Every structure is written in structure tokens, then in C-alpha cells.
From Swiss-Prot:
Designated name of the protein: UPF0758 protein BCAH187_A4587
Swiss-Prot/TrEMBL keywords: Hydrolase, Metal-binding, Metalloprotease, Protease, Zinc
MPN domain span: 103-225
Keyword flag Transmembrane: no
An MF annotation (GO) of this entry: metal ion binding
Motif (JAMM motif): 174-187
UniProt cross-references to Pfam families, sorted A to Z: RadC, UPF0758_N
InterPro entries to which the protein is assigned, alphabetical: MPN, RadC_JAB, RuvA_2-like, UPF0758, UPF0758_CS, UPF0758_N
CDD domains reported for this sequence: MPN_DUF2466 (cd08071)
Length: 225
């Protein structure tokens, strides 16, 4: 016997990870490492397959709720909590790269900063990035969750945080859960209202970015700002 090398089999993804590295594992094997054990009826890899099939792959799984996970036979609160915590850590690690006073020089910079966090959201989220005079992000805040319209997104809520943070300018973003970032009439109306308020109080609204699935639209580039 040669120790750990002799126990590397298909049903032992953790041992494969130790010997070959995490990059060599499939999605089902990585999920099995997080789950640690299967149930009395199935192996951990079979449980991984069932979870991935239930959510049609990683895209939907990463946003799974506790209730959705525990509805799967073999997944209890402990396993569900482990998965939710792992996915949240992954999201935070993606953000970490950009959080150290990330500078925004173009709509592409802004979309890159928020794309992975916003493109899979199941509801519309209206988010503001608050910038200093060097166009560095000093704060961001979700202002509203739900269908965007001018009666709900109130300038008071947008600019209140700008004053608190002594922001020089603002970039607004929201996502389209459909994946299509084409602006609606309401999107344009909200944008024009915020831009006008910004002019009056001296805090410029630089852009309004609509996030789709790996696509975005800048309302400034479209001529609406």
C-alpha cells in the first residue's frame, strides 16, 4: 500500500483534491467535497448529481435558498448551510478584487465591477456607486429591490447617501433578470429625473448601467445622460 495514493478512487473526491489539486475535480466532485458525506441511500457523488440536476447546474444552485436545498432528499440543514456559506464566500472573493478603491474610467469598468454580483439576481436591484473626485468607489448601496419606476426610486434616497459619504458623483446600476439589458421607458425616465436632481444639488450622475447576462447597456452612451 502506498498510503493516500492507494485510496484514490472515483468515490473519493477529497483524496483526489489532496493529490491533484482542486482544479482537477469536476463540479460534482467539488460539490461532494463540500457535502462531505452522502446519505444512507446514496453516495456523496450521487447526492451531488441529484443536487446539480435539481438546479440545472451551478448557475441556479449558487442562488439556492435554505428551503430549496433541504427540500432535496438527503440534504439537511447542516449540508444546506455549508453550501450557502461556500457560495457566499465565493461571491465575496470576487468582490474583494475590486473593493480596494476601485477606479471607474468607463462604462466597461463599472459593468466589470458589478456584473458577477448582479447578472443572476432574480429581482431587479437598483444600486448606487458613490465616487470620490478621483472616480474611485468609496461606497455602494442597494437603494431598492423590485420593478423599477420613477415613483419608487426617489432621488432623496439616492442622494442622502451621497451627502453622508461626501461623494463627488454617482453611478446608478440595475439588473434585468431576463438577461436582456435593453432600457425600458421607465429606465430612461428614472435616469433623467436623477440626473436633473444631481445637477440641482451639485452631485453629478455619471451614468446609469443596466446589467444583463454578460451584457450591459450604458444610458450615457445611448445619449440619455
Amino acid at each position: 500500500m502506498n498510503g493516500i495514493r492507494d485510496v484514490v478512487k472515483e468515490e473519493q473526491p477529497r483524496e483526489r483534491l489532496l493529490l491533484e489539486g482542486a482544479g482537477s475535480l469536476s463540479n460534482r466532485e467539488l460539490l461532494a467535497v463540500l457535502l462531505r458525506t452522502g446519505s444512507k441511500d446514496e453516495t456523496v457523488l450521487k447526492l451531488s448529481d441529484k443536487i446539480l440536476h435539481h438546479f440545472d447546474g451551478l448557475r441556479m444552485l449558487k442562488d439556492a435558498t435554505l428551503e430549496e436545498l433541504v427540500s432535496i432528499h438527503g440534504v439537511g440543514v447542516a449540508k444546506a448551510s455549508q453550501l450557502i456559506a461556500a457560495f457566499e464566500l465565493g461571491r465575496r472573493m470576487v468582490r474583494l478584487e475590486y473593493q480596494n478603491r476601485y477606479s471607474i474610467r468607463s462604462p466597461e469598468d463599472c459593468a466589470r465591477y458589478m456584473m458577477e454580483e448582479m447578472r443572476f439576481l432574480q429581482q431587479e436591484h437598483f444600486v448606487c456607486l458613490y465616487l470620490n473626485t478621483k472616480n474611485q468607489v468609496i461606497h455602494r448601496q442597494t437603494i431598492f429591490i423590485g420593478s423599477l419606476n420613477s415613483s419608487i426610486v426617489h432621488p432623496r434616497e439616492v442622494f442622502k447617501e451621497a451627502f453622508r459619504r461626501a461623494a463627488a458623483s454617482i453611478i446608478c446600476l440595475h439588473n434585468h433578470p431576463s438577461g436582456d439589458p435593453a432600457p425600458s421607458r421607465e429606465d430612461i425616465e428614472v435616469t433623467k429625473r436623477l440626473v436633473e436632481c444631481g445637477r440641482i444639488i451639485g452631485i453629478e450622475v455619471l451614468d446609469h448601467i443596466i446589467i444583463g447576462d454578460h451584457k450591459f447597456v450604458s444610458l450615457k452612451e445611448k445619449g440619455h445622460i
